[in-house]
């Protein structure tokens, strides 16, 4: 049964790759794939540029930092110093900089500015604007799907998944949608009640969500996320991850400072089987920096 499934999967992959198409259609498919590959690369480069380079929230007055922890303020001061703005504080669209600000900063206007900066990445009608890139990707994806015999791109994507059809996906999402919406409405009501209690004369907006969700959580459960941070120091997280991998899969991670890395912040580990056989090299790269895609790798 497993071998039959493997053969079916391989055949389907060839079919989805255009193996059954006549030669001229295969050439057309290759061209579409090349264009989509270049556009996808361009999309990512634009988002990366907008995230890392083209937006900075510069704070001049210390009172505008109210609500932020000392380590977040210190990191913003260091970012400002590196940008040649010593004595100020700079927040970027990188998650470790942006999320604490949205979650804890009391200055609502600055939260709005930072949130909208993130929301509008690659949407400023400049060299990094993605509107036309997205339109081109949508058009080419539709062409590729139809070339391969599918009615649309959605049908092409889910054909080899468990859902099989876009209609099944819609039905599944609709089952989730109603209870999720009710839960979100309840959370919104709790946050609006907190705003009203504090004398706020405004309706909850998107840039308020993290801030008031944290306040409601703290009021309801006496839980302050900032107090959890000492338990999740990077060294502890790495040790925990390695421990779990060893328990689940029996593999070992051995730190290898002798192996060259592409950046001084990256760390190299050799991964071995339980008996010491070499599996491969694993790089860990946790910190944001200019030119790097967001997130820990």
Language-model regions: role of each:
Residues 14-16, 97-104, 122-127, 157-169, ...:
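Second-shell loop/turn segments in exported
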Residues 95-99, 103-108, 268, 288:
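His/Glu-rich zincin catalytic helix
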Residues 24, 95, 111-112, 118, ...:
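Substrate/cofactor-recognition hotspot
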Residues 89, 99-102, 109, 113, ...:
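Propeptide (latency) domains of metzincin metalloproteases
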Residues 103, 123, 130-131, 136-137, ...:
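Recognition helices and adjacent regulatory flanks at domain boundaries
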Residues 115-122, 219-225:
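Short glycine/proline-rich turn/loop motifs
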Residues 6-8, 38, 45, 49-92, ...:
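Active-site-proximal, well-structured secondary-structure segments within enzyme catalytic domains
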Residues 2-47:
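Extended, charged alpha-helical coiled-coil/arm scaffolds that mediate oligomerization and mechanical coupling
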């Amino acid at each position: 049964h497993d071998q039959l499934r493997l053969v079916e999967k391989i055949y389907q992959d060839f079919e989805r790759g255009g193996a059954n198409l006549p030669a001229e259609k295969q050439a057309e498919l290759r061209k579409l794939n090349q264009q989509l590959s270049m556009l996808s690369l361009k999309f990512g480069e634009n988002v990366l540029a907008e995230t890392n380079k083209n937006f900075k929230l510069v704070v001049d007055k210390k009172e505008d930092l109210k609500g932020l922890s000392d380590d977040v303020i210190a990191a913003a001061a260091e970012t400002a110093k590196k940008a040649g703005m010593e004595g100020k504080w700079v927040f970027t669209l990188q998650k470790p900089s942006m999320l604490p600000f949205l979650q804890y900063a009391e200055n609502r206007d600055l939260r709005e500015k930072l949130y909208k900066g993130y929301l509008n990445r690659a949407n400023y009608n400049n060299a990094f604007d993605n509107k036309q890139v997205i339109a081109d990707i949508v058009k080419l994806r539709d062409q590729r799907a139809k070339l391969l015999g599918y009615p649309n791109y959605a049908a092409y994507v889910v054909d080899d998944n468990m859902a099989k059809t876009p209609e099944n996906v819609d039905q599944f999402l609709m089952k989730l949608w109603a209870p999720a919406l009710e839960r979100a409405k309840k959370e919104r009501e709790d946050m609006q009640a907190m705003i009203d209690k504090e004398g706020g004369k405004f309706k909850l907006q998107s840039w308020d969500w993290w801030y008031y969700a944290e306040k409601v959580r703290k009021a309801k459960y006496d839980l302050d996320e900032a107090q959890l941070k000492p338990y999740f120091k990077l060294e502890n997280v790495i040790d925990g991850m390695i421990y779990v991998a060893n328990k689940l899969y029996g593999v070992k991670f051995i730190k290898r400072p002798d192996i060259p890395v592409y950046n001084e912040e990256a760390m190299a580990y050799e991964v071995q089987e339980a008996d010491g056989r070499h599996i491969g090299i694993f790089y860990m790269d946790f910190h944001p920096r200019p030119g790097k895609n967001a997130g820990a790798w």
